Amino acid sequence: MEIGKQTRLSRPHRLSESSKVYRWADQANNLLQGLNEQRQHGQMCDVVLVADDQRIPAHRALLAVSSPYFQAMFTLGMREEHESEIELVGASYVGVKAVIDFLYSGNLPLDGGNIDYVLETAHLLQVWQAVDFCCQYLEKEVREDNYLYLQELALLYSLDRLDAFIDRFILKHFSTLAITSEFLQDVRMFKLCAYLSSEQVQCLNEETLFEVAFKWLKQKPERLEFALQLLSNIRFALIPFYLLKYYVLPNLHSLLPLDTSCKVLVEEAIDYHRKLSAQPVMQTQRTGLRGGVECLLLLGGEVSERGEGLSAEVCWLDEEAGKWVEETKMPAPRSQHCVAVLGGFIFTAGGSCSPDNGGDSASDMLYRYDPRRCHWIKGAPMNQRRVDFYLGTMGECLIAVGGRNDSGPLSSVEVYHPADDHWTYVAELPKFTYGHAGTIHKGIVYISGGHDYQIGPYRHDMLSYDPKTADAWNECQAMILARGWHSMASLEDRIYAIGGSDDHEDSMERFDVLEVEAFDPQTNQWTMIAPLRYASSEAGLAVLNRKIYVLGGYSWETMDFSQGTQVFDPDKEQWTLGPNLPKHIAGPSCVCLIEPELIDSIDTE
Protein backbone atom coordinates (compact mmCIF):
# COMPACT_ATOMS: atom_id res chain seq x y z
CA MET A 1 0.00 0.00 0.00
CA GLU A 2 1.35 3.38 -0.93
CA ILE A 3 1.85 5.78 1.93
CA GLY A 4 -0.84 8.47 2.10
CA LYS A 5 -3.15 6.72 -0.33
CA GLN A 6 -6.58 5.84 1.07
CA THR A 7 -8.04 2.49 0.25
CA ARG A 8 -11.53 1.15 0.81
CA LEU A 9 -11.65 -1.93 2.95
CA SER A 10 -13.73 -4.76 1.68
CA ARG A 11 -16.81 -5.56 3.81
CA PRO A 12 -17.02 -9.09 5.09
CA HIS A 13 -20.76 -8.61 5.65
CA ARG A 14 -23.32 -6.34 4.03
CA LEU A 15 -24.42 -3.30 6.19
CA SER A 16 -28.02 -2.26 6.60
CA GLU A 17 -29.42 0.09 3.97
CA SER A 18 -31.61 1.91 6.53
CA SER A 19 -30.58 5.47 7.47
CA LYS A 20 -30.48 7.32 10.78
CA VAL A 21 -30.01 11.03 11.50
CA TYR A 22 -27.76 11.96 14.41
CA ARG A 23 -28.29 15.30 16.12
CA TRP A 24 -25.61 17.44 17.71
CA ALA A 25 -27.72 18.82 20.54
CA ASP A 26 -25.24 21.44 21.72
CA GLN A 27 -24.18 22.60 18.27
CA ALA A 28 -26.10 25.90 18.35
CA ASN A 29 -24.91 26.74 21.87
CA ASN A 30 -21.34 25.83 21.03
CA LEU A 31 -21.49 27.94 17.89
CA LEU A 32 -22.76 31.00 19.75
CA GLN A 33 -20.24 30.46 22.53
CA GLY A 34 -17.45 30.28 19.99
CA LEU A 35 -18.61 33.42 18.19
CA ASN A 36 -18.87 35.24 21.51
CA GLU A 37 -15.31 34.24 22.43
CA GLN A 38 -14.11 35.50 19.05
CA ARG A 39 -15.95 38.78 19.64
CA GLN A 40 -14.44 39.23 23.09
CA HIS A 41 -10.96 38.71 21.65
CA GLY A 42 -11.60 40.89 18.62
CA GLN A 43 -11.24 37.96 16.23
CA MET A 44 -13.13 37.38 12.97
CA CYS A 45 -15.49 40.35 13.63
CA ASP A 46 -16.47 42.29 10.51
CA VAL A 47 -18.35 45.25 11.99
CA VAL A 48 -18.08 47.58 14.99
CA LEU A 49 -21.12 49.25 16.51
CA VAL A 50 -20.60 52.67 18.10
CA ALA A 51 -22.79 54.12 20.86
CA ASP A 52 -21.86 56.97 23.21
CA ASP A 53 -18.38 56.94 21.59
CA GLN A 54 -17.79 53.39 22.77
CA ARG A 55 -17.20 50.47 20.40
CA ILE A 56 -18.77 47.03 20.37
CA PRO A 57 -17.37 44.48 17.85
CA ALA A 58 -19.79 41.99 16.27
CA HIS A 59 -20.48 39.67 13.33
CA ARG A 60 -22.73 40.99 10.57
CA ALA A 61 -24.23 37.59 9.87
CA LEU A 62 -25.32 37.08 13.47
CA LEU A 63 -26.74 40.60 13.71
CA ALA A 64 -28.69 40.15 10.48
CA VAL A 65 -30.33 36.85 11.45
CA SER A 66 -31.18 38.14 14.95
CA SER A 67 -32.51 41.60 14.12
CA PRO A 68 -34.78 42.77 11.26
CA TYR A 69 -33.20 46.21 11.77
CA PHE A 70 -29.72 44.91 10.90
CA GLN A 71 -31.09 42.57 8.23
CA ALA A 72 -32.47 45.57 6.35
CA MET A 73 -29.31 47.63 6.96
CA PHE A 74 -26.99 44.97 5.53
CA THR A 75 -29.09 43.74 2.59
CA LEU A 76 -31.04 46.67 1.15
CA GLY A 77 -28.17 48.69 -0.25
CA MET A 78 -27.74 51.14 2.62
CA ARG A 79 -24.36 52.80 3.04
CA GLU A 80 -23.82 50.95 6.32
CA GLU A 81 -23.67 47.71 4.35
CA HIS A 82 -20.02 48.37 3.47
CA GLU A 83 -18.91 50.40 6.52
CA SER A 84 -16.69 48.79 9.11
CA GLU A 85 -18.01 51.06 11.88
CA ILE A 86 -21.67 51.92 12.30
CA GLU A 87 -22.81 54.60 14.71
CA LEU A 88 -26.19 53.95 16.30
CA VAL A 89 -27.31 57.54 16.75
CA GLY A 90 -29.47 58.10 19.82
CA ALA A 91 -28.80 54.66 21.26
CA SER A 92 -27.05 54.28 24.62
CA TYR A 93 -23.95 52.20 25.12
CA VAL A 94 -25.59 50.49 28.13
CA GLY A 95 -28.56 49.43 26.03
CA VAL A 96 -26.61 48.40 22.91
CA LYS A 97 -24.09 46.35 24.87
CA ALA A 98 -26.83 44.55 26.82
CA VAL A 99 -28.79 43.70 23.67
CA ILE A 100 -25.72 42.57 21.66
CA ASP A 101 -24.52 40.47 24.60
CA PHE A 102 -28.02 38.94 24.67
CA LEU A 103 -27.80 37.98 20.99
CA TYR A 104 -24.58 36.08 21.67
CA SER A 105 -25.37 34.57 25.08
CA GLY A 106 -29.16 34.41 25.37
CA ASN A 107 -28.91 36.09 28.79
CA LEU A 108 -30.43 39.52 29.49
CA PRO A 109 -29.68 40.98 32.96
CA LEU A 110 -32.29 43.61 33.85
CA ASP A 111 -32.56 45.97 36.80
CA GLY A 112 -33.94 49.37 37.65
CA GLY A 113 -30.79 51.05 36.39
CA ASN A 114 -30.69 49.64 32.86
CA ILE A 115 -34.28 48.70 31.97
CA ASP A 116 -35.06 52.00 30.20
CA TYR A 117 -31.89 51.80 28.08
CA VAL A 118 -32.34 48.13 27.22
CA LEU A 119 -36.00 48.51 26.28
CA GLU A 120 -35.28 51.53 24.10
CA THR A 121 -32.45 49.75 22.29
CA ALA A 122 -34.24 46.42 21.92
CA HIS A 123 -37.21 48.22 20.40
CA LEU A 124 -34.96 50.23 18.05
CA LEU A 125 -33.10 47.13 16.87
CA GLN A 126 -36.34 45.11 16.72
CA VAL A 127 -35.01 42.34 18.95
CA TRP A 128 -38.49 41.32 19.99
CA GLN A 129 -37.50 38.56 22.41
CA ALA A 130 -35.51 41.12 24.40
CA VAL A 131 -38.51 43.45 24.30
CA ASP A 132 -40.70 40.65 25.66
CA PHE A 133 -38.24 39.98 28.49
CA CYS A 134 -38.33 43.70 29.33
CA CYS A 135 -42.11 43.52 29.49
CA GLN A 136 -41.95 40.51 31.78
CA TYR A 137 -39.57 42.39 34.09
CA LEU A 138 -41.74 45.50 34.14
CA GLU A 139 -44.89 43.49 34.87
CA LYS A 140 -43.30 42.40 38.14
CA GLU A 141 -42.60 46.03 38.98
CA VAL A 142 -46.09 47.47 38.44
CA ARG A 143 -47.23 49.29 41.58
CA GLU A 144 -49.67 52.03 42.51
CA ASP A 145 -46.90 54.65 42.42
CA ASN A 146 -45.59 53.85 38.91
CA TYR A 147 -48.36 52.23 36.86
CA LEU A 148 -49.22 55.43 34.95
CA TYR A 149 -45.58 55.96 33.96
CA LEU A 150 -45.29 52.35 32.84
CA GLN A 151 -48.54 52.68 30.90
CA GLU A 152 -47.10 55.65 29.00
CA LEU A 153 -43.97 53.59 28.34
CA ALA A 154 -46.10 50.77 26.98
CA LEU A 155 -48.00 53.14 24.71
CA LEU A 156 -44.79 54.82 23.52
CA TYR A 157 -43.21 51.55 22.41
CA SER A 158 -46.46 49.77 21.46
CA LEU A 159 -45.88 47.12 24.12
CA ASP A 160 -49.21 45.35 23.85
CA ARG A 161 -48.36 42.75 26.47
CA LEU A 162 -47.35 45.29 29.12
CA ASP A 163 -50.23 47.58 28.19
CA ALA A 164 -52.75 44.76 28.64
CA PHE A 165 -51.18 43.80 31.97
CA ILE A 166 -51.45 47.35 33.29
CA ASP A 167 -55.05 47.55 32.09
CA ARG A 168 -55.85 44.45 34.16
CA PHE A 169 -54.00 45.96 37.13
CA ILE A 170 -56.04 49.16 36.90
CA LEU A 171 -59.33 47.31 36.48
CA LYS A 172 -58.61 45.15 39.52
CA HIS A 173 -57.68 48.12 41.73
CA PHE A 174 -59.97 50.67 40.12
CA SER A 175 -61.78 51.59 43.34
CA THR A 176 -58.57 52.84 44.95
CA LEU A 177 -56.65 54.08 41.91
CA ALA A 178 -59.40 56.07 40.20
CA ILE A 179 -59.97 58.45 43.12
CA THR A 180 -56.34 59.64 43.20
CA SER A 181 -55.37 63.01 41.77
CA GLU A 182 -52.69 61.37 39.60
CA PHE A 183 -55.22 59.14 37.89
CA LEU A 184 -57.77 61.90 37.34
CA GLN A 185 -55.09 64.22 35.99
CA ASP A 186 -53.08 61.87 33.79
CA VAL A 187 -55.15 58.92 32.57
CA ARG A 188 -55.96 59.21 28.89
CA MET A 189 -59.53 59.61 27.71
CA PHE A 190 -59.60 56.49 25.52
CA LYS A 191 -58.24 54.46 28.42
CA LEU A 192 -60.83 55.77 30.85
CA CYS A 193 -63.59 54.98 28.35
CA ALA A 194 -62.26 51.43 28.10
CA TYR A 195 -62.23 51.02 31.89
CA LEU A 196 -65.73 52.45 32.35
CA SER A 197 -67.11 50.13 29.66
CA SER A 198 -65.28 47.04 30.90
CA GLU A 199 -67.07 44.02 32.33
CA GLN A 200 -64.08 43.48 34.64
CA VAL A 201 -63.86 46.90 36.30
CA GLN A 202 -63.85 46.36 40.05
CA CYS A 203 -65.87 49.00 41.83
CA LEU A 204 -68.31 49.00 44.72
CA ASN A 205 -71.17 50.44 42.68
CA GLU A 206 -72.07 52.25 39.48
CA GLU A 207 -72.42 55.63 41.18
CA THR A 208 -68.71 55.50 42.00
CA LEU A 209 -67.93 55.02 38.30
CA PHE A 210 -70.06 58.06 37.51
CA GLU A 211 -68.17 60.01 40.17
CA VAL A 212 -64.84 59.12 38.52
CA ALA A 213 -66.08 60.19 35.08
CA PHE A 214 -67.55 63.40 36.50
CA LYS A 215 -64.32 64.36 38.31
CA TRP A 216 -62.20 63.56 35.25
CA LEU A 217 -64.35 65.87 33.10
CA LYS A 218 -64.02 68.67 35.67
CA GLN A 219 -60.21 68.57 35.59
CA LYS A 220 -59.84 70.52 32.34
CA PRO A 221 -62.39 72.55 30.32
CA GLU A 222 -61.26 70.97 27.05
CA ARG A 223 -62.39 67.58 28.31
CA LEU A 224 -66.06 68.56 28.31
CA GLU A 225 -66.38 67.87 24.58
CA PHE A 226 -65.87 64.18 25.42
CA ALA A 227 -68.67 64.09 28.01
CA LEU A 228 -71.16 62.08 25.96
CA GLN A 229 -68.49 59.65 24.77
CA LEU A 230 -67.36 59.08 28.35
CA LEU A 231 -70.74 58.98 30.10
CA SER A 232 -72.20 56.57 27.54
CA ASN A 233 -70.16 53.91 29.34
CA ILE A 234 -71.93 54.45 32.66
CA ARG A 235 -74.79 52.05 33.38
CA PHE A 236 -77.08 54.64 34.94
CA ALA A 237 -79.87 52.09 35.38
CA LEU A 238 -77.73 50.41 38.06
CA ILE A 239 -77.70 53.64 40.11
CA PRO A 240 -80.58 54.01 42.61
CA PHE A 241 -83.46 56.21 41.54
CA TYR A 242 -83.02 58.82 44.27
CA LEU A 243 -79.34 59.31 43.40
CA LEU A 244 -80.16 59.74 39.72
CA LYS A 245 -82.77 62.37 40.46
CA TYR A 246 -81.15 64.29 43.30
CA TYR A 247 -77.42 63.85 42.66
CA VAL A 248 -76.55 62.79 39.11
CA LEU A 249 -78.92 65.08 37.19
CA PRO A 250 -78.14 68.25 39.21
CA ASN A 251 -74.38 67.67 38.88
CA LEU A 252 -74.63 67.12 35.14
CA HIS A 253 -76.68 70.29 34.79
CA SER A 254 -74.09 72.32 36.71
CA LEU A 255 -71.24 70.93 34.61
CA LEU A 256 -73.02 70.91 31.24
CA PRO A 257 -75.88 73.43 31.47
CA LEU A 258 -76.54 73.47 27.72
CA ASP A 259 -76.12 69.75 27.06
CA THR A 260 -79.14 67.53 26.46
CA SER A 261 -77.56 64.33 25.13
CA CYS A 262 -75.99 63.34 28.45
CA LYS A 263 -79.21 64.10 30.32
CA VAL A 264 -81.05 61.72 27.97
CA LEU A 265 -78.89 58.88 29.29
CA VAL A 266 -79.95 59.64 32.85
CA GLU A 267 -83.61 60.14 31.96
CA GLU A 268 -83.57 56.76 30.22
CA ALA A 269 -82.41 55.19 33.50
CA ILE A 270 -85.03 57.08 35.52
CA ASP A 271 -87.70 55.72 33.19
CA TYR A 272 -86.26 52.22 33.74
CA HIS A 273 -86.68 52.60 37.50
CA ARG A 274 -90.23 53.90 37.19
CA LYS A 275 -91.32 50.90 35.12
CA LEU A 276 -90.44 48.42 37.82
CA SER A 277 -92.36 45.39 36.60
CA ALA A 278 -91.25 45.90 32.98
CA GLN A 279 -87.52 45.88 33.78
CA PRO A 280 -86.95 42.26 32.66
CA VAL A 281 -88.02 43.18 29.12
CA MET A 282 -86.14 46.50 29.07
CA GLN A 283 -82.67 45.00 29.24
CA THR A 284 -79.86 46.68 27.26
CA GLN A 285 -76.09 46.98 27.54
CA ARG A 286 -76.62 49.74 30.12
CA THR A 287 -78.82 47.67 32.46
CA GLY A 288 -76.82 44.46 32.74
CA LEU A 289 -74.50 43.46 35.54
CA ARG A 290 -70.81 44.07 34.98
CA GLY A 291 -68.62 41.01 34.82
CA GLY A 292 -71.34 38.69 35.97
CA VAL A 293 -70.71 34.95 36.18
CA GLU A 294 -73.28 32.22 35.70
CA CYS A 295 -74.12 30.56 39.01
CA LEU A 296 -76.25 27.60 40.01
CA LEU A 297 -78.81 28.53 42.67
CA LEU A 298 -80.94 26.33 44.94
CA LEU A 299 -84.15 27.90 46.26
CA GLY A 300 -86.38 26.65 49.07
CA GLY A 301 -87.67 23.11 49.42
CA GLU A 302 -88.78 20.82 52.22
CA VAL A 303 -86.02 19.98 54.68
CA SER A 304 -85.95 16.63 56.48
CA GLU A 305 -83.77 17.71 59.42
CA ARG A 306 -85.57 17.53 62.76
CA GLY A 307 -87.30 20.73 63.76
CA GLU A 308 -87.27 22.16 60.26
CA GLY A 309 -90.03 22.28 57.70
CA LEU A 310 -89.93 24.41 54.59
CA SER A 311 -86.89 26.41 53.64
CA ALA A 312 -86.64 29.99 52.37
CA GLU A 313 -82.88 29.82 51.78
CA VAL A 314 -81.32 30.72 48.44
CA CYS A 315 -77.86 29.14 48.07
CA TRP A 316 -75.36 29.24 45.23
CA LEU A 317 -72.76 26.65 44.30
CA ASP A 318 -69.14 27.68 44.79
CA GLU A 319 -67.63 25.30 42.25
CA GLU A 320 -64.01 25.99 43.22
CA ALA A 321 -64.59 25.35 46.92
CA GLY A 322 -67.07 22.55 46.23
CA LYS A 323 -69.67 23.88 48.64
CA TRP A 324 -72.99 25.72 48.79
CA VAL A 325 -73.12 29.29 50.10
CA GLU A 326 -76.27 31.07 51.30
CA GLU A 327 -76.93 34.27 49.35
CA THR A 328 -80.34 35.44 50.54
CA LYS A 329 -83.77 34.21 51.59
CA MET A 330 -87.03 34.13 49.68
CA PRO A 331 -89.85 36.31 51.04
CA ALA A 332 -91.57 33.15 52.34
CA PRO A 333 -90.61 29.46 52.78
CA ARG A 334 -91.78 27.29 49.89
CA SER A 335 -91.55 23.80 48.43
CA GLN A 336 -92.89 22.37 45.17
CA HIS A 337 -92.68 25.92 43.79
CA CYS A 338 -91.26 26.87 40.40
CA VAL A 339 -88.62 29.33 39.28
CA ALA A 340 -87.64 30.85 35.95
CA VAL A 341 -85.20 33.50 34.73
CA LEU A 342 -86.23 36.41 32.53
CA GLY A 343 -84.05 39.40 31.72
CA GLY A 344 -81.51 38.52 34.40
CA PHE A 345 -84.17 38.34 37.16
CA ILE A 346 -85.38 35.26 39.07
CA PHE A 347 -89.14 34.73 39.26
CA THR A 348 -90.49 32.30 41.82
CA ALA A 349 -94.16 31.36 41.66
CA GLY A 350 -96.69 29.21 43.48
CA GLY A 351 -95.66 26.25 45.57
CA SER A 352 -96.72 24.94 48.94
CA CYS A 353 -96.50 26.89 52.17
CA SER A 354 -96.97 23.74 54.29
CA PRO A 355 -95.01 20.48 54.58
CA ASP A 356 -98.30 18.63 54.09
CA ASN A 357 -98.35 19.13 50.34
CA GLY A 358 -101.56 18.03 48.71
CA GLY A 359 -102.79 21.12 46.97
CA ASP A 360 -104.62 22.56 49.98
CA SER A 361 -101.70 24.87 50.77
CA ALA A 362 -100.99 25.91 47.18
CA SER A 363 -99.94 29.53 46.63
CA ASP A 364 -100.61 31.99 43.82
CA MET A 365 -97.82 34.37 44.81
CA LEU A 366 -95.18 35.66 42.38
CA TYR A 367 -91.92 37.20 43.55
CA ARG A 368 -89.04 38.64 41.55
CA TYR A 369 -85.40 38.71 42.66
CA ASP A 370 -82.89 41.27 41.38
CA PRO A 371 -79.29 40.02 41.78
CA ARG A 372 -78.01 43.54 41.10
CA ARG A 373 -79.22 44.65 44.53
CA CYS A 374 -80.19 41.36 46.24
CA HIS A 375 -83.75 42.63 46.40
CA TRP A 376 -87.16 40.92 46.16
CA ILE A 377 -90.39 42.52 44.96
CA LYS A 378 -93.89 41.12 44.68
CA GLY A 379 -95.51 40.70 41.27
CA ALA A 380 -99.10 40.15 40.25
CA PRO A 381 -100.37 36.83 41.65
CA MET A 382 -101.33 34.03 39.29
CA ASN A 383 -104.98 33.65 38.39
CA GLN A 384 -104.97 30.27 40.15
CA ARG A 385 -103.05 28.90 43.10
CA ARG A 386 -100.66 26.22 41.89
CA VAL A 387 -98.37 23.57 43.30
CA ASP A 388 -96.68 20.67 41.46
CA PHE A 389 -96.81 22.64 38.19
CA TYR A 390 -94.32 23.90 35.60
CA LEU A 391 -93.05 27.45 35.08
CA GLY A 392 -90.87 28.43 32.13
CA THR A 393 -89.61 31.45 30.21
CA MET A 394 -91.31 31.86 26.85
CA GLY A 395 -89.89 34.81 24.93
CA GLU A 396 -90.63 37.91 27.01
CA CYS A 397 -93.23 36.12 29.14
CA LEU A 398 -93.51 33.38 31.75
CA ILE A 399 -95.84 30.41 31.29
CA ALA A 400 -97.38 28.43 34.17
CA VAL A 401 -98.72 25.00 33.21
CA GLY A 402 -101.13 22.78 35.14
CA GLY A 403 -100.58 21.76 38.75
CA ARG A 404 -103.14 21.42 41.51
CA ASN A 405 -104.69 23.35 44.39
CA ASP A 406 -107.44 22.87 46.95
CA SER A 407 -109.93 22.41 44.09
CA GLY A 408 -107.96 19.47 42.70
CA PRO A 409 -105.84 18.94 39.57
CA LEU A 410 -105.66 21.74 37.00
CA SER A 411 -105.63 21.88 33.22
CA SER A 412 -105.35 25.65 32.98
CA VAL A 413 -102.31 27.43 31.55
CA GLU A 414 -101.55 31.09 32.09
CA VAL A 415 -98.92 33.52 30.84
CA TYR A 416 -97.33 36.38 32.79
CA HIS A 417 -96.60 39.63 30.95
CA PRO A 418 -94.01 41.60 32.95
CA ALA A 419 -94.42 44.70 30.79
CA ASP A 420 -97.80 45.37 32.43
CA ASP A 421 -97.59 42.92 35.36
CA HIS A 422 -100.57 40.70 34.66
CA TRP A 423 -101.49 37.09 33.85
CA THR A 424 -103.67 35.91 30.96
CA TYR A 425 -105.01 32.45 30.18
CA VAL A 426 -103.92 30.61 27.03
CA ALA A 427 -104.91 27.22 25.61
CA GLU A 428 -105.47 24.75 28.43
CA LEU A 429 -104.10 21.23 28.59
CA PRO A 430 -106.21 18.39 27.16
CA LYS A 431 -106.27 16.74 30.62
CA PHE A 432 -105.89 17.68 34.24
CA THR A 433 -102.15 17.43 34.95
CA TYR A 434 -99.97 17.76 38.02
CA GLY A 435 -96.65 16.23 39.11
CA HIS A 436 -95.42 16.63 35.53
CA ALA A 437 -92.12 18.12 34.37
CA GLY A 438 -91.39 20.68 31.71
CA THR A 439 -88.70 22.49 29.76
CA ILE A 440 -88.29 25.05 27.00
CA HIS A 441 -86.47 23.78 23.91
CA LYS A 442 -85.75 26.26 21.10
CA GLY A 443 -88.71 28.43 22.04
CA ILE A 444 -91.20 25.56 22.36
CA VAL A 445 -92.73 24.46 25.68
CA TYR A 446 -92.62 20.72 26.41
CA ILE A 447 -94.27 18.93 29.35
CA SER A 448 -94.24 15.21 30.09
CA GLY A 449 -95.69 12.63 32.43
CA GLY A 450 -97.52 13.50 35.60
CA HIS A 451 -100.90 12.57 37.00
CA ASP A 452 -104.50 13.59 36.47
CA TYR A 453 -106.16 12.11 39.58
CA GLN A 454 -105.13 11.05 43.05
CA ILE A 455 -104.83 7.36 42.18
CA GLY A 456 -103.72 5.32 39.19
CA PRO A 457 -100.51 5.01 37.21
CA TYR A 458 -98.61 7.98 35.87
CA ARG A 459 -98.54 8.98 32.21
CA HIS A 460 -96.14 8.52 29.30
CA ASP A 461 -97.49 11.56 27.45
CA MET A 462 -95.44 14.46 26.16
CA LEU A 463 -97.10 17.63 24.88
CA SER A 464 -95.71 20.72 23.20
CA TYR A 465 -96.89 24.31 22.92
CA ASP A 466 -95.47 26.66 20.28
CA PRO A 467 -97.00 30.14 20.58
CA LYS A 468 -95.51 31.13 17.23
CA THR A 469 -97.69 28.65 15.34
CA ALA A 470 -100.94 28.26 17.29
CA ASP A 471 -102.52 28.63 20.70
CA ALA A 472 -102.82 24.88 21.14
CA TRP A 473 -101.13 21.90 22.76
CA ASN A 474 -99.84 19.16 20.46
CA GLU A 475 -99.11 15.53 21.24
CA CYS A 476 -95.51 14.40 20.79
CA GLN A 477 -93.94 10.96 20.84
CA ALA A 478 -94.67 9.47 24.26
CA MET A 479 -91.87 8.62 26.67
CA ILE A 480 -90.69 5.03 26.93
CA LEU A 481 -91.52 4.98 30.65
CA ALA A 482 -94.38 6.55 32.53
CA ARG A 483 -93.25 8.83 35.32
CA GLY A 484 -94.23 11.72 37.57
CA TRP A 485 -92.45 14.03 40.01
CA HIS A 486 -89.52 13.81 37.58
CA SER A 487 -87.36 16.48 35.95
CA MET A 488 -86.83 17.64 32.39
CA ALA A 489 -83.93 19.47 30.79
CA SER A 490 -83.08 20.92 27.40
CA LEU A 491 -79.43 20.67 26.45
CA GLU A 492 -78.22 21.37 22.93
CA ASP A 493 -80.32 19.26 20.52
CA ARG A 494 -81.94 16.90 23.02
CA ILE A 495 -84.61 16.92 25.71
CA TYR A 496 -84.08 14.77 28.80
CA ALA A 497 -86.64 13.13 31.10
CA ILE A 498 -84.94 12.25 34.38
CA GLY A 499 -85.91 10.10 37.35
CA GLY A 500 -89.23 10.45 39.13
CA SER A 501 -91.57 7.71 40.29
CA ASP A 502 -94.58 5.64 39.21
CA ASP A 503 -97.26 3.38 40.73
CA HIS A 504 -97.53 -0.35 40.15
CA GLU A 505 -100.79 -0.94 38.29
CA ASP A 506 -101.79 -3.93 40.37
CA SER A 507 -100.93 -2.70 43.87
CA MET A 508 -100.77 1.08 43.38
CA GLU A 509 -97.55 0.91 45.39
CA ARG A 510 -95.14 3.71 44.52
CA PHE A 511 -91.68 2.86 43.18
CA ASP A 512 -88.67 4.93 42.13
CA VAL A 513 -87.76 5.44 38.48
CA LEU A 514 -84.01 5.80 38.04
CA GLU A 515 -84.09 5.52 34.26
CA VAL A 516 -83.24 8.54 32.10
CA GLU A 517 -84.33 8.97 28.51
CA ALA A 518 -83.42 11.53 25.84
CA PHE A 519 -85.71 12.84 23.11
CA ASP A 520 -84.51 14.10 19.73
CA PRO A 521 -87.13 16.44 18.20
CA GLN A 522 -85.58 15.98 14.76
CA THR A 523 -86.10 12.22 14.69
CA ASN A 524 -89.08 12.21 17.09
CA GLN A 525 -87.46 9.37 19.05
CA TRP A 526 -86.75 8.65 22.70
CA THR A 527 -83.55 6.80 23.67
CA MET A 528 -82.64 5.28 27.03
CA ILE A 529 -79.34 6.59 28.39
CA ALA A 530 -77.34 6.20 31.62
CA PRO A 531 -79.62 5.97 34.68
CA LEU A 532 -79.35 8.08 37.81
CA ARG A 533 -77.05 6.97 40.62
CA TYR A 534 -79.96 7.04 43.08
CA ALA A 535 -83.65 8.00 43.26
CA SER A 536 -84.64 11.63 42.77
CA SER A 537 -88.36 12.36 42.75
CA GLU A 538 -89.24 16.00 43.46
CA ALA A 539 -85.67 17.12 42.79
CA GLY A 540 -84.39 20.45 41.57
CA LEU A 541 -82.75 20.66 38.15
CA ALA A 542 -80.67 23.17 36.21
CA VAL A 543 -78.16 23.17 33.36
CA LEU A 544 -74.76 24.75 34.00
CA ASN A 545 -71.73 24.67 31.70
CA ARG A 546 -73.28 22.04 29.42
CA LYS A 547 -73.99 19.70 32.32
CA ILE A 548 -77.28 18.73 33.95
CA TYR A 549 -77.46 19.11 37.73
CA VAL A 550 -80.09 17.18 39.71
CA LEU A 551 -80.26 18.43 43.29
CA GLY A 552 -81.78 16.68 46.29
CA GLY A 553 -85.05 14.80 45.85
CA TYR A 554 -86.97 12.00 47.49
CA SER A 555 -87.02 8.21 47.33
CA TRP A 556 -90.49 6.69 47.60
CA GLU A 557 -89.03 3.26 48.29
CA THR A 558 -86.82 4.26 51.23
CA MET A 559 -88.80 7.40 52.16
CA ASP A 560 -85.52 9.31 52.43
CA PHE A 561 -84.74 12.90 51.48
CA SER A 562 -81.52 13.34 49.50
CA GLN A 563 -78.63 15.67 50.23
CA GLY A 564 -76.81 14.74 47.06
CA THR A 565 -76.03 16.35 43.72
CA GLN A 566 -76.00 14.23 40.56
CA VAL A 567 -74.29 15.66 37.48
CA PHE A 568 -74.77 14.40 33.92
CA ASP A 569 -72.09 14.99 31.29
CA PRO A 570 -73.62 14.48 27.81
CA ASP A 571 -70.20 14.08 26.20
CA LYS A 572 -69.35 11.12 28.42
CA GLU A 573 -72.96 9.96 28.78
CA GLN A 574 -72.46 9.35 32.49
CA TRP A 575 -73.55 10.59 35.91
CA THR A 576 -71.14 11.71 38.62
CA LEU A 577 -71.66 13.02 42.15
CA GLY A 578 -71.30 16.72 42.89
CA PRO A 579 -71.01 18.69 46.15
CA ASN A 580 -73.58 17.75 48.79
CA LEU A 581 -76.38 20.19 49.52
CA PRO A 582 -76.47 22.03 52.86
CA LYS A 583 -79.37 19.83 54.00
CA HIS A 584 -81.46 16.82 52.99
CA ILE A 585 -84.13 18.38 50.84
CA ALA A 586 -86.98 17.63 48.44
CA GLY A 587 -89.18 19.91 46.38
CA PRO A 588 -86.59 22.68 45.86
CA SER A 589 -86.25 24.71 42.70
CA CYS A 590 -83.03 25.38 40.85
CA VAL A 591 -81.95 27.90 38.28
CA CYS A 592 -78.83 29.34 36.67
CA LEU A 593 -78.43 33.11 36.89
CA ILE A 594 -75.81 35.73 36.07
CA GLU A 595 -74.56 36.96 39.44
CA PRO A 596 -72.05 39.70 40.38
CA GLU A 597 -68.48 38.43 40.27
CA LEU A 598 -66.37 38.50 43.41
CA ILE A 599 -63.71 41.22 43.29
CA ASP A 600 -60.91 38.84 44.27
CA SER A 601 -61.67 36.56 41.32
CA ILE A 602 -60.02 38.94 38.82
CA ASP A 603 -56.29 38.34 38.49
CA THR A 604 -53.70 40.39 36.66
CA GLU A 605 -51.65 37.37 35.72
Swiss-Prot record:
Residues 45-112 form the BTB domain. GO terms for biological process: protein ubiquitination. Pathway: Protein modification; protein ubiquitination. It comes from the Eukaryota. InterPro entries: BACK, BTB-kelch_protein, BTB/POZ_dom, Kelch-typ_b-propeller, Kelch_1, SKP1/BTB/POZ_sf. Keywords: Kelch repeat, Repeat, Ubl conjugation pathway. Pfam families: BACK, BTB, Kelch_1, Kelch_KLHDC2_KLHL20_DRC7. Probable substrate-specific adapter of an E3 ubiquitin-protein ligase complex which mediates the ubiquitination and subsequent proteasomal degradation of target proteins. This is Kelch-like protein 36. SUPFAM superfamilies: Kelch motif, POZ domain. Kelch repeats lie at residues 295-344, 346-396, 397-443, 445-493, 494-546, 547-595. PANTHER family: KELCH-LIKE PROTEIN 36, LD33804P. GO terms for molecular function: cullin family protein binding. Residues 147-248 form the BACK domain. The keyword Lyase does not apply.
